[in-house]
Each structure stands twice: as structure tokens, then as C-alpha cells.
Amino acid sequence: MKIAFIGAGSIGFTRRLLADILSVKELQNVEIAFTDINPRNLDMVTQLCQRDIDSNGLSIKILSTLDRREAFRGAKYVISCVRIGMLEAFTKDIEVPLRYGVDQCVGDTLCAGGIMYAQRDIAAFRDFCKDIREVADPNCLLLNYSNPCAMVTWYCNTYGKVKTVGLCHGVQGGHHLIAKALGYEQKDIDIICAGINHMTWYISVKHNGEDLNYKLLDALKADPDIARTEKVRIDMMKHFGYFSTESNGHLSEYVPWYRKHTENIHKYIDLGVWINGETGGYLRVCTEGRNWFETDFPNWLKEPPYEYKEEKRSGEHGGRIIEALETGRVYRGHFNVINDGAITNLPDDCVVEVPGYVDKNGISIPKVGDLPLGCAACCMSNVSVQRLAVHAALEGDITLLRQAMLLDPLVGAACEPDAIYQMTDELLIEEAEWLPQYAQEIERAKARIEKAKADGTFIPPIVTQGAARLHTKTVEEMMLDREAAKNNAQEADKAKKRT
């Protein structure tokens, strides 16, 4: 059996997820393939992971290749952790909208950054899915960790014709936070979540069968750390009655209220940790983390290798799903799948995040029923944008792309329509190398920008670093505190629990 990783150069995540898989005795003789477009990152992650494998006494030899089809050939599972455009495109996702007053913390799920990320991803996943269909195992399952998770998963299932499950750790992180607030161990709190990726709602929170949702808001407010760092999530629960899975910074981007006035952003965020709302926080951490890893890599090779043990596995779903499908050991988690009636008051064709069970028979999704109306309405505001963005990406349809931007909750709150049109043109121009489906529209966008500058209708950019921007440290600055630099770099690791 073969498992292929695409975007394997996502070093911390690939290494941790591989350890999760190879900690399962029945999976210790699988074939492993890594592929990436960055040869240096691919080489570094291969060195680290092969050393881990060897130190655990396994005979696996990683196939490390720049040839995607070679990696996919015969694979029963493909795990995606790609970032199309890498940090160069990510920087544009944050900086261009900021010139129009759109202040993002993460920018990888919705808002202007998430919409553009989907345009790049879908252009690339068109080829990925084609390769999977042509050379992978006929029953290959794509486990997608790439953001924007919902839109990529929507495309791959519906248009790429590859069975795909989107995976995220937001549910697990919020579960930990809820247990902490209520004064219990996480294992003693039973939760059910339903919604859409990064806006999933804890619709059931129980301890020994007792519903504790009525206690949760007061418990969250009473915890000094949570009250300081999760102001948006607490305020959303006050208005909608249920706690949301995603972090303060993430959630602040998916609704129109918390980031539209730059002078008020500090009221709702905390700068202690990037994910609590810092302007461009995830970009800063990813940039510092990449630069630090490239500098500090020789020291990583001197550290003890990972031990492949059950008790050291992470909370990520990927390894558990493969284990359940291959061994029959039942796994319960929350997964991103085509709705198909699971949540009855969201569209059947959208991607929802809901409970699921996995065993040798496959992945089974129970019927959740209706979400509370207010929660469903919040989700629908995002689903409508996702639908427009996915369809825009299919053929490079600028009309649908503009409409996605117009209807995005934060973009629409921060900008007038003319500014949104101009911002969209600038994003297309600056990200042209990753958007082949927009080639003709990009030339038209250039002409519109030139005409606007010539006739005086060009909207001048806002000169700002954002309402809550922190300095991106140089390698030299990070070297002054190596331990802090390493810890900060790990904040960009998808496998790290952030609560």
C-alpha cells in the first residue's frame, strides 16, 4: 500500500503526520512517497523523516521526487498540504487588500485572501486530480489539509472527480478550550460539532450525559486567559448561543463586525499570540518559521529523532482515518465532506464539517439535522461566497470573482464596490503567475488600471501597515533567542495544537 504526500516540503506537518501513520503497527510496511516543487525543502524533510524511520527500525525507504505523477502512481492515499504560490502569493493576499482597508489576520479561508487562495489552488488541483485519476489506485482517497479547505474539497469532489475528505484540527483545539473553561479533562467532555470549516459550532457539549452548553458562556468569561484571547468567539456565542471551533483571529475575518474599522480592531483582539487577531499574523509567523528552519536545519538533524509510539501521536485526523480504513478499528472525528443532507438547512452540494465514523466499510456521515437558525445563517453567508469563488476559479470568470468579493462579509463591510473591483484587478495582476485561467482577464485588468490612472478615477491606496501589525524578525534577530525562535516557528506547524 502506498501513501503519497504532495506539498511534502511543509516540513513540520509532514514529519508529524508521517509519525502518526507509522506509529500504527499494521502500517509499518507501507510505501511512502514525497513530492514538492521546492527541491531544497523536499530534501530537508526527506532527510528528517528517513532518519526517523531508520531510528525506529523500519525498512521503509522514502521515494522523494519532483515528479508528481511518479509519487502518485499506485497510491491508495494522497495527503495534500500544498500552499500554491507559497509565501510570495500569501504576502500579496494580505498586502493588496490592506491597501483598501481589508485587515486580515490569517487570510487563508475566506475574505479576499481566501478567495484568491482558492483561485490559485483550484488551478493547480485541476492537474493534481487529473494525475490521481490517471495513475493512482482507482479507489484512491485524497486527504486534503490545504486551505481554503472547504473550497478545495468542494472542487476536488464535484469537479475533480476524486473522492476527497477535508481535514482540520479546529474542532480538537476548541474541544480542549471548552474542557479547560469547564474544569474537566478533554476526554471527559463529549462534543458534537456541525457547520462549515472554520465556522463549525459546538451544538452539543456534555459531561456524563449532562448538557453543559448553558454553563459555557459564563465559564469562558470567567477564565482570564480565555476572556482576554477569545473576545470574538465569546461575543459570537453571546449573540448566537453556541461556541465556534475556530480561533479568535480566524473567526474575526468571516463576519462583518470585528475588523471593518481599524480603530476598533484592538477592542476584539489580543497580540500575545498571532492567532488571536494580529494583522497578517499568520504570514509573519510563516515567514519567520521558514527563514528560521532554513537557517537552523543542521541543528534539527542533531536533535533526537521522533519515536513512533501510540502515546506520542498527534490529534490530526489523517493517520487515524488511514488506520481505521485499513485495520477496521473504529475512529470518530469531524470531517469536511459534501453535505448531501447531513445538515438539512444548508445546501446539499456545499462542503460541511460534521461528525463521522471510519472503519473498514469506509467513512460514514450521520444526519445532523438542522443547525440553529442563526448559526446556519452565518454559515450561509460564507457558503455563498465559497460557491461563487469555486465557480469563478473553474473558468477564470471575473464576474463571479468580483461577486464573491462583493458578498464576502468583511470585504463588503470594509470597501465600496468600486474599490472592490479595483482591488480584484490588482490581485489578479500581482498573482498572475499562479492564475493561468485568468490570462485574458489579467490583460484587461492591466488596461483598466492604466485607464483609471490616466483619467483620474484610480482610487488611491491606503498607506498602512494594518491596525495590529507586529515586526517580522530577521534571522539575526531570532538568533538572539534561539528557543523562542524555534517555538515561534512551530506556531506555523499545522500539527501543533494552538489553545
Set out the residue ranges of the language-model regions:
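Long, compositionally biased stretches enriched for glycine and/or charged residues
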Residues: 183-496
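Short acidic low-complexity segments
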Residues: 61-74
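Internal, well-ordered domain-core segments that constitute the primary functional module
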Residues: 127-206
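NAD(P)-binding Rossmann-fold cofactor-contacting core
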Residues: 26-52
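Rossmann-fold NAD(P)-binding glycine/threonine-rich loop
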Residues: 88-159
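Gly/Ser/Thr-rich loops at beta-strand to alpha-helix junctions
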Residues: 8-13, 39-41, 86, 144-152, ...
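Hydrophobic or amphipathic alpha-helical targeting/insertion segments
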Residues: 74-82
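N-terminal Rossmann-like dinucleotide-binding module
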Residues: 3-32
